[in-house]
Amino acid sequence: MKNEKLKVDNHIHNNIQFIDCLEFWVSNAKSFIKSFLQPMNFEVIGTRFNDERSRIQYLLLNNVISRSNLQNQFQIENNSYIKPIQGNQFIKVTSSISPNDLDFHSKIQKHGDFIQNISFYCNDINLAYNKSINNGAKSVQLPMKEYFKNCKDIVETAIIESPFKDLQHTFINRNITSFDDNNNNNYDNNKEIFGNPLFLYPEFQEIKDKELFKIEKEDSSSINGCTGSLDHIATCIKNGEMNYFVEWYRKCLGFKLLSDKDSVATDESENFENELILDKNFYVITKSDFKYTKKENIGLKMAVLSNQPLNTSFHKTPPIQFVISEAIQGGEGQIEQFIHYFGGEGVQHLAFNSNNIFKAVEIAKSQKLEFVYIPQSYYSKLDERLKHLFPNSIPKILKENLMKFGILIDSDAITNTNENNSNNNNNNDSQNNTEINQNIGYIKQIFTKYINDRPTMFFELIERSNALGFGKGNIIALFESLEKESSGSQLKSD
């Protein structure tokens, strides 16, 4: 039984629509959730064991109104789809409870806590799977259907290996019809259904121990949206591998290099997708860009892949963005450091959207989540560095909040001037303020400290104000801050 196709947003050119779920493999799930995910407004809503009962898995969702009552609080379309405007993201956290689970324990020993699976919601999983396999991807699981609730609910999945070792990609599609009696199940009469988010994950059971992950927090109306959907996934690869990874995602998943509207191809040709254009869709940062690092051989090459459309007349932040950072030859920076301690190439950090980054950081810090320290010297140079964005000077209240919470700010590499960009936030900094150049987008970012003892994975919060790309200045500031932390020279706890 085939479910109705989703209404495809005009900013998506691809069968692959958005990132459905991220799966962590961690050594201690409860500790990981309480230490890192709950401070970013994620709530545990479900749990399950695998068939062998050797692993336990928790399902988390952010912006949950009430974990004690999940009914009628979640917007679902086409019996299968979460409306992205809600700013939600599902995460699975998996941990082994068996000493004999050698595959799990060997990978944790090699990588530490890490991202093991990135799931993509697809209109047609067979199309996505066949395209990837025909272009060289390796199969993990053939397309299959799982039936739940007396065969009323159907979840289709297929799994492939990604080009990153020990990272898999799942293609998923749903046909969920068994809503509760309070909802009208007739799709023709109800284009949007409000229900329990667990309807979309029927293999999970609602968590029984309501006290297990209970935390004291502010009223949900004041914090929802502080941490939203995934903005981008940042990865690290070895020197000389950029073309291979770009080609793999282009051919196997149909992604393209993120660029501004003047550079978007006007037809379905693949020539543009395959071309790395310096300072358009491909960036190089060298030692000369750094002012405060002591290391001599430091830098990176960076490209951003996305499911941005091939032909568009306007900007809109794509729902999928993969940042690929390549190490330099003989380098000593954070990219090379990640590869060494992680045991190869992989996901370095996840960035989540925020509609109020100051509030999000305040809440996270109140729950003991630690962020990298940004030296005051960074803020002393802001007026000069961002003169093109703030012709007079940075508004006083904005600068004070940036310094108070340790947040970076930069104009993006690709400016988005589209007023209808629903993925970007309202520009709270410029309301009734003529001091901002409205034609230039900008971003505010902050990064957590490493979540492992190894200097490998961390998280990011990002607030976009009419911005599409990434700021080069913030990348440099992050490099220098992480160098201080990993070298042990950072004595101050933020």
Curated annotation (Swiss-Prot):
Keywords, ordered alphabetically: Dioxygenase, Iron, Metal-binding, Oxidoreductase, Repeat
One MF annotation (Gene Ontology) recorded for this entry: metal ion binding
Family according to the record: Belongs to the 4HPPD family.
EC class of the enzyme, as a word: oxidoreductase
Task of the protein: May have dioxygenase activity.
Binding annotation for Fe cation: 232, 349, 460
Identification of the protein by name: Uncharacterized 4-hydroxyphenylpyruvate dioxygenase-like protein
Cofactor requirement: Fe cation
Organism field: Dictyostelium discoideum
Presence of the UniProt keyword Hydrolase in the record: no
Domain VOC: 18-174, 229-408
Classification via InterPro entries: 4OHPhenylPyrv_dOase, 4OHPhenylPyrv_dOase_C, 4OHPhenylPyrv_dOase_N, Glyas_Bleomycin-R_OHBP_Dase, Glyas_Fos-R_dOase_dom, VOC
Signal peptide: none
Gene name in the database record: hpdl-1
Keyword Ribonucleoprotein on entry: no
Cofactor annotation remark: Binds 1 Fe cation per subunit.
Biological process per Gene Ontology, one example term: tyrosine catabolic process
EC number: 1.13.-.-
